[in-house]
Design a protein with these regions (language model features):
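Gram-negative bacterial Sec-dependent N-terminal signal peptides
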Residues: 2-21
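Electrostatic cytochrome c docking/interface patches
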Residues: 18-35, 49-52, 102-128, 207
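Predominantly soluble domains enriched in secretory-pathway, periplasmic, or organellar proteins
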Residues: 21, 102, 117-124, 135, ...
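The feature marks the first
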Residues: 26-73
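Sequence context surrounding c-type heme c attachment/ligation sites in exported
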Residues: 29-36, 61, 123-135, 154-163
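The canonical Cys-X-X-Cys-His
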Residues: 31, 38-45, 96, 131-140, ...
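Axial heme c-ligation environment in periplasmic c-type cytochrome domains
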Residues: 49-55, 70-113, 146-152, 169-195, ...
């Protein structure tokens, strides 16, 4: 089990080092104009008012670009997003990523009942079942890793995070490099997923 945890951590490090050359450039002002149709779901500044839809504000440009490209190519599927991304050019994708990454993420909050288990899963994982610590890839403050395209989770809607973790677990979502997320969550229980989703939503570090 310990070897599995080290394997995931090593995979994160190796992928980060091999992805360091990935650069996302774009025009935030042009992205703001392109983003107008996105506002109905993702909010005026990328802070979605609905927990069903993700906050895009403050998310890493590298991650945003990859997700839009994956929706466009079919590597990630969602009825709404696949349709929205289909007509985006590479320039549109870069501009949208630049715009949303330049916005400020609205902080979340963690209900008290999820703190203990959520913190344990995030910082330590579950040694008995072989679930690795989320912190190994997403960082101590859930800020993610832009060089490796690991997303920022801090401030994200707990409901959205929970949905994505369960989608990885079931295999419905499969656009994670080297199956890292599918491997990490496959032995997580519903209770663990719910707790860690709420925990990271409220986790933040002083800038």
């Amino acid at each position: 089990m310990m070897l599995k945890r080290f394997a995931v951590a090593a995979a994160c490090i190796l992928f980060a080092s091999s992805s360091g050359a990935v650069m996302v450039t774009g025009d935030p002002e042009a992205g703001a104009a392109t983003a107008m149709p996105c506002q109905s779901c993702h909010g005026l500044d990328g802070n979605s008012p609905s927990p069903e839809w993700p906050k895009l504000a403050g998310q890493h440009a590298t991650y945003l670009k990859k997700q839009l490209q994956d929706y466009r190519s079919g590597a990630r599927v969602n009825a709404i997003m696949s349709s929205m991304a289909a007509s985006l050019s590479d320039e549109d994708v870069a501009n949208l990523a630049a715009y949303y990454s330049s916005q400020t993420t609205a902080e979340g909050a963690t209900p008290e009942q999820y703190v203990e288990l959520g913190e344990k899963m995030y910082q330590q994982g579950n040694k008995e079942s072989g679930v690795p610590a989320c912190m190994a890839c997403h960082g101590p403050g859930a800020q993610g890793n832009p060089a490796a395209s690991w997303p920022r989770l801090s401030g994200q809607h707990a409901q959205y995070i929970e949905t994505q973790l369960k989608s990885y677990r079931s295999g419905e979502r499969a656009n994670d490099p080297n199956e890292i997320m599918r491997g990490a969550v496959k032995k997580m229980t519903d209770e663990e997923i719910t707790a860690v989703s709420h925990y990271v939503s409220g986790l933040h570090v002083a800038e």
